[in-house]
Amino acid sequence: MAKPDIHPTWYPDAKVICNGEVVMTTGSTTPELHVDVWSGNHPFFTGTQKILDTEGRVDRFMRKYGMGSANPDVDAPAPKKAAKKSDAESDS
């Protein structure tokens, strides 16, 4: 049995507020929860996330494992030209 008068008040319909807008309700010990980010405005969940690649790590990984370039705008390096035959090989 729970001890009386030691537990916080439970609010079964606490409002979750993001940017002044009620985005959902949940149960909590406070009547309102103010959040900066939630799934409705986070880039990962909205599909607008961009890969920030400041040091070329993603491209290096893609080249290493043969997956092409992570950025389609970046051209792949040109294939190396075949070495010229030396004069000794052409005389034979």
From Swiss-Prot:
Residues 66-92 are annotated as: Disordered. GO terms for biological process: translation. Keywords: Ribonucleoprotein, Ribosomal protein, RNA-binding, rRNA-binding. Residues 70-80 have a biased composition (Low complexity). It holds the Pfam family Ribosomal_L31. GO terms for cellular component: ribonucleoprotein complex; ribosome. InterPro entries: Ribosomal_bL28/bL31-like_sf, Ribosomal_bL31, Ribosomal_bL31_A, Ribosomal_bL31_sf. Transmembrane segments: none annotated. Belongs to the bacterial ribosomal protein bL31 family. Type A subfamily. Part of the 50S ribosomal subunit. Binds the 23S rRNA. This is Large ribosomal subunit protein bL31. It comes from Synechococcus sp. (strain RCC307). The gene is rpmE.
